[in-house]
Structures are given as structure tokens and as C-alpha cells.
Regions:
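Typically the conserved alpha-helix immediately C-terminal to a functionally engaged Cys/Sec
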Residues: 82-94
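Non-catalytic, surface beta->alpha helical segment in thiol-disulfide oxidoreductase systems
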Residues: 125-159
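The canonical Cys-X-X-Cys-His
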Residues: 78-81, 123
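Thiol-based oxidoreductase modules, predominantly thioredoxin-like and allied folds used
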Residues: 96-110
Length: 159
């Protein structure tokens, strides 16, 4: 009886710790795993060629921002997608060269699978070439979003 109670307490403690750890990561941006870019230059722009995992305007169904693009994967039953959309729209509107694109994860399963989107909202911050700079899953915090966007707009300086 006492052994069973101890086992139950251990399981509850482990589950609580796991839940706390997941909650702390939710909505926080993390750097994307970079895929080495081809060393060649993009013919038309003279800039480095985009990485192989970069997203194009054709992938998104909308033009990329001149400096950055905020991409939100949403679903109809997502409780946090509306507030996240409002925040991303505001940040894109207030910063020159930043675009916002919302993608219905259920309608674009090709991208959902390719980018390993497991929950909504998932937010990607893309650079000017469509390379994924960072991503977050869950409700996004304004400060974290501004830091992630700042890292793309001014990669060498403070944001």
C-alpha cells in the first residue's frame, strides 16, 4: 500500500515537472536549425543563395517581406490563433519591410509536414530570402516576438 502511494507520488511529480517544462517553452522563440546554404550567389540579387529549407513566395502564396516575413500556422479550432494573428499583424504593420502571412495548417498539409508543425499557432520568422530564422509554438509573447524580429532586421546589433 505504501509502495503504491510512493509510486503514485513519483509519477505525479514527474508529470508535473514535464508539464512545467513544456509550459515554459510554449510561445518562446528558438533558433531554427540552419541548413548550410549553397556557396553560390543568387543570380539576380548578388546576395547569397537561400538555404535549401527556405520558403518562397510560391510556398507561402504571398510575397515575402523585403526584410522579414512572419508566418503563422493556424487552425479553425485554435484558441490562441486569433490573439497571435492580431499581434503579428500589428508588428508587421509597424515595421517597414516586414510582411505577415497566415497559413491554414489543415489546408496546407504539405507545408505542415515539411516544417514539422505539430501544434497551432506555430510562428516562423523568416529572413529576406525566406530562410527560417526562428520559430515558436503556442501563444507568442510580444517581447519574444520583437526580439526574434529584431534579430532578423539587425542581425549584428541590438534590437
Amino acid at each position: 500500500m505504501v509502495g503504491g502511494l510512493i509510486a503514485l507520488l513519483v509519477v505525479l511529480a514527474a508529470a508535473s515537472a514535464a508539464g512545467f517544462a513544456m509550459r515554459r517553452r510554449q510561445g518562446r522563440f528558438r533558433s531554427a536549425e540552419p541548413t548550410p546554404a549553397a556557396p553560390t550567389q543568387a543570380a539576380s540579387s548578388g546576395r547569397p543563395a537561400p538555404s535549401p529549407d527556405a520558403l518562397s513566395a510560391a510556398d507561402l502564396g504571398a510575397p515575402l517581406g523585403a526584410q522579414a516575413t512572419l508566418v503563422q500556422f493556424s487552425t479553425q479550432v485554435c484558441a490562441y490563433c486569433g490573439p497571435t494573428r492580431e499581434l503579428l499583424t500589428e508588428v508587421a504593420r509597424d515595421r517597414d519591410g516586414v510582411a505577415f502571412v497566415e497559413i491554414d495548417a489543415a489546408e496546407r498539409m504539405d507545408l505542415t509536414r515539411r516544417l514539422h508543425v505539430l501544434s497551432t499557432p506555430t510562428v516562423l520568422v523568416l529572413d529576406a530570402l525566406g530562410g527560417i530564422s526562428s520559430r515558436a509554438s503556442g501563444p507568442v509573447r510580444r517581447g519574444d516576438l520583437l526580439t526574434a524580429v529584431g534579430a532578423v532586421l539587425d542581425p549584428g546589433g541590438a534590437s
